[in-house]
Every structure is written in structure tokens, then in C-alpha cells.
Amino acid sequence: VQITGDFLPTQKMQTPYGEFDAPGVADLIEKDGVWEFTTPEPLAPELYSYTMLVDGLKINDPSNVHRIRDVQSVSDVFIIPGERADLYSINDVPHGTVSKIWYNSPTLGMDRRLTVYTPAGYETSGKRYPVFYLLHGMGGDENAWTELGRASQILDNLIARGEAEPMIVVMTNGNAALQAAPGESSLGFTAPSMALPKTMEGSFETHFPEVVKFIDKNYRTIKNKKSRAIAGLSMGGFHSIHISKQYPDMFDYVGLFS
């Protein structure tokens, strides 16, 4: 019985495409019916993920119900508190609201699902807010930033610290052939996949003004370029740069995370 996780040193692996760093693996020790692993040194504050290997078969830790999904990979997680890791935790601060909303896209010919974060106090403040459009990477969906990336916890904590301005954050589904994340549309419990059609051929970028129009109509936004930002991870960065290029009057801030 072994454990593999991002708190272990990586190991070099040879492949037909060259050498790369593979996740580290360590043996678990059985003691009184409990399998244990002790790190050589205390772990630094951070959010860590791991899985277990039983005779080479990957399984999740049956004693840990806290898990994240990254495309088809499901891992157990834990947080060592302190420093940056406190941003990922639910702390005693005002909390925003996360909503799953459907909008119609004539360009893509379907109703589509997105995630919207509104900051603490939005419901009663009467204020208008800037909007940050946050796009996921390849294989992700509209759930990725909140479920995998803990975006709502990070935003709550940054805003409470005064390190971020209260804002609306919109997290779309960048897979233009799909309505929503696996299990969240009429397709049923489909398997997540990296190999989806219409992810980077321009359809998602072309339809994006429909998202902005929907958000401006249904939320108290500041409806101008200088109050909008767009950024994304990996494929989301690709989408961000091309959306900002295709619609230069839409966003004053553009970020590429990789």
C-alpha cells in the first residue's frame, strides 16, 4: 500500500517523449490495522492533494471525504493552515454567494451554464461592481474555479483583508460544444474529457459578448471597459488573449496565468 501526492518529492520518469517529473510515491506502514505515512519534515502551509495505491491500483482515502476533481482525476485534499494556505480556508469573514446560472447563446445555439460569485453584501448594498471574467484550463468547466481552485474562499479572504476590491466574478464553460459540466446538463452523467471538440477553434471567443451582455443585464455591474477584467489558466489564458484581441473595447485588464 502506497501514497502519492504533491507533498512528496517528484521522481524522474522516462517516456517516448523524453524525461519528465512524475508524482512521488511512498510506502505506507501498517500499524494496528491503520496504514500511516509520516513526512520526513513538517509540511509548509498549503493545500495538498493525494491518492493511495493498493497493489498499483489508484484509490481514494476512505477516511477522507474531502476531494477535488481535475478532469477525470479525483484526489483527496487537506490544508496545513497558515500563511498563503489561509486564503484557501473558510475563515470568520463576510462570505459572498456562488450561483449557477443559465444563459442563452444564439451563436452557439444552446442554453449554457456558468458560475457567478457575488461579494458579501451584494444583495443589500445597491452598489454597482466591477466584473472579473475568470476562465478555466483544458478539461475544466464552469465548476473548476470554485470546486478545484477554491475561488470563492480566496475572494472572500482577499476582500476581507482589503487586498481585493469587491467584485463580481464570472466563471464560464470554455467548451463551446457543451452546455455545462459533466452531470449538469441533459446529457446526464457523462465522463469528463480533455479531448473535447470546439475548445480552441474560435467559437467560444466569438460568442463571449453574449456572456457580458447577460451579466450586465442581470447583475449590478459597472458597464464599461475600465471596470472589466478577463484572465484564465492555460486554455483559459488562450481564450482571454483572443477574446481581448477580438473585442478590444471590452476589457481594460487581461491576465494569462500560463
Predicted regions mapped to residue ranges:
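Primarily recognizes the serine-hydrolase "nucleophile elbow" in alpha/beta-hydrolase
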Residues: R150-Q153, E210, K217, I222-S258
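Alpha/beta-hydrolase active-site loop
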Residues: G109-D111, G183-R220
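Solvent-exposed loop/turn segments at secondary-structure junctions
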Residues: P9-T10, L108, G137-D141, G174-L178, ...
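Short beta-strand segments enriched for Tyr within beta-sheet-rich domains
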Residues: I3, E46-V54, V116, Y129, ...
